A protein has these predicted regions:
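N-terminal regulatory/effector-sensing and dimerization cores
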Residues: 2-94
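An amphipathic alpha-helical interaction segment
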Residues: 76, 80, 101-160
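Short acidic-hydrophobic, aromatic-tinged amphipathic segments that line or gate anion-handling sites
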Residues: 95-99
Length: 160
């Protein structure tokens, strides 16, 4: 199977103003959900990513971000034989703001549980959860780009 979670943490808090800097990337895919504002280096300068921003880093892309004050996020480092960001239309190596961050965060919580407990079929379930998270983020971006859609699923499905 061409899938594995390397590390997954839900609602992780680190020290104030902590900086993460991986000039060569981490060698795996990284999906981040920022719970607090973060400074993110975009290749030329730091930008401020607001609360509930997401970031999907590809395999060898530089990862450079710093907490504005307190670092709090949920994240998943994973390996997959295909680029799920590309497959599902997720912005790569740049900050984005899906509408449904609570649901995305819940999927990361479930992934962390599965990663720790290792119940039967854990790898298959972890892959399903990561794919669901990526699809949910993609759909959350589409809703954001369609302002006439409301959060009500039925009315959105009928109009969009």
């Amino acid at each position: 199977m061409e899938f594995s979670i390397h590390i997954c943490e839900y609602n992780r808090s680190n020290t104030d103003c902590e900086t993460i800097y991986r000039p060569e990337g981490s060698g795996d895919y990284l999906f981040l959900l920022f719970k607090k504002p973060m400074k993110v280096y975009d290749g030329t300068a730091f930008i401020i990513a607001q609360e509930n921003a997401c970031l999907f880093y590809t395999l060898d892309h530089e990862q450079h971000y710093q907490a504005v004050q307190k670092l709090r996020n949920s994240y998943v480092h994973f390996w997959c034989g295909e680029n799920l960001g590309e497959k599902y239309g997720i912005p790569q190596n740049t900050v984005f703001y899906p509408q449904n961050t609570e649901a995305i965060d819940e999927l990361i919580r479930l992934q962390q549980r599965e990663y720790i407990v290792k119940d039967p079929y854990a790898v298959e379930y972890e892959e399903a959860l990561v794919r669901q998270m990526m699809i949910m983020a993609s759909r959350g971006m589409r809703r954001r780009s369609r302002p006439d859609c409301t959060r009500n699923f039925r009315s959105c499905a009928l109009r969009c």
